Amino acid sequence: TPDYSEVAKLADLWMHPKQGTDAAVAMAMGHVILKEFYFNKRSSYFDDYARRYTDLPLLVVLEDKTLPDGRVVKVPGRYVRASDFVGQLGQANHPDWKTVAYNVDGQVALPNGSIGFRWGQDGRDDQGLWNLENKDARQGNTVKLKLSVLEDGAQAHEITDVAFPYFGGIDTPNFNANDQGNDVMLRRVPITYLDLNGEGVAGRVAVATVFDLQVANYGVNRGLEGEGADGGYDANAPYTPAWQERITGVPREQIITIARQFADNADKTHGKSMVIIGAAMNHWYHCD
């Protein structure tokens, strides 16, 4: 909180970003956590949790988009769904609400428990399969979903540029901008191709995992072809601790320390780290 409140005076560490810049704080913390707990040394707890209970392994369609300057780039679109495949992966009940991922063997998996399994007519084939379990819903066999196509035995892939929007350079009356020279960031992302025939997608379609897209958006350097040198936490590049310092006023060293401690505690306690928002965004929109 930017206010030295009753809560702040009792805290071990008080971080006071400029009002309204907490998103930049969160992005920089995410950058540190991804780099140190997923790449420098993978947390086994985070790895298992991310594969089983998050959307990080799920596949996303990459679409071609023409920028105002005429360049054609790939951008993240929607999730790949069972309805995009010929035969709908055998799903008669809401296949357009069932997401897919890669198993560690490189084959497409239909994870048990996505939203498409949660309602439908009584007596349907997938009735009762709404639990999030590490199983393929078709045969019930155990699966281990891939976070990245580069891991668990890298499968055939390409490294290509994917475009992400950048809003940190917008000048406003009340906030410091951090101009990076462009409002579109091109990041290197490993992609694969699937033969699809669904709504808005047909033929050989480029896809990527949410994890690979998220890591790229956060600016975490993985040493991919064409990625360039890693400037570290002191580089003024989007979402690094140094980048947020220019926007929030919070020293980069404090961001690094808090991110490490927050993630380390979550790792050791299996998830017992919490962000308590208080009477803010969750005070409105029917959250009272």
Kindly give the residue locations of the regions a language model identified:
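Long, well-ordered, tryptophan-enriched scaffold segments
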Residues: A8-K9, L13-F262, K268
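Short, polar loop motifs at secondary-structure junctions
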Residues: T1-E6
